[in-house]
């Protein structure tokens, strides 16, 4: 039985949480990505947003952030076209729409975020065919996904 790689789209909030608290669930997901157990997927918007947030709130982490991106070498989701983006813009801000639409175009296994206010509001999940989860729930999904291969 061949185990396909579990591809997880990391929202900016989860990536930053992993940098700030490597011992948490977000940090564990990054370690799984480092080990090649899961495939980290991001979009150009996530990288730009992370750099912008860190430059303003945690400037001491900007260089570490850039080194980590190079080390992790995430898969880059395709940039969405205006047509792809339209239904996402009806429910989300421009930045969030760009991120979730890119995840959708990348056909990921899960979308992991700490931004529950926006990504988990009514109607957003109907735009995608994958679960939108917080890091601890993503770890539980991963465990459930690999369970059949452990026996």
Task: Describe the role of every protein-language-model region.
Residues 109-110, 116-151:
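Acidic, PIN/NYN-like endoribonuclease modules and their adjacent C-terminal/linker elements
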Residues 8-10, 20-57:
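PIN/NYN-family metal-dependent endoribonuclease catalytic core
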Residues 14-15, 46, 98-99, 117-119, ...:
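Alpha-helix capping/helix-boundary segments
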Residues 32, 102, 124:
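Hydrophobic/aromatic ligand-binding patch that stacks against planar heteroaromatic rings
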Residues 1-6, 149-151:
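Intrinsically disordered, low-complexity and often Lys/Arg-enriched segments
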Residues 93-110:
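Acidic, metal-associated active-site segment
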Residues 45, 66-90:
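Acidic catalytic patch
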Residues 13, 18-19, 89-92:
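Short, glycine-rich nucleotide/cofactor-binding loops
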């Amino acid at each position: 039985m061949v185990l396909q790689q579990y591809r997880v789209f990391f929202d900016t909030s989860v990536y930053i949480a992993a940098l700030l608290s490597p011992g948490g669930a977000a940090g564990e997901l990054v370690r799984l990505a480092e080990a090649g157990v899961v495939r980290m997927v991001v979009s150009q918007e996530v990288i730009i947003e992370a750099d912008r947030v860190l430059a303003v709130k945690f400037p001491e982490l900007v260089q570490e952030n850039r080194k980590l991106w190079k080390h992790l070498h995430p898969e880059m989701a395709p940039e969405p076209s205006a047509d792809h983006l339209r239904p996402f813009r009806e429910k989300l801000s421009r930045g969030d729409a760009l991120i979730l639409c890119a995840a959708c175009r990348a056909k990921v296994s899960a979308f992991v975020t700490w931004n529950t206010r926006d990504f988990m509001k009514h109607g957003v999940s109907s735009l995608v065919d994958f679960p939108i989860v917080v890091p601890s729930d993503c770890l539980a999904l991963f465990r459930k996904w690999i369970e059949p291969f452990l026996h």
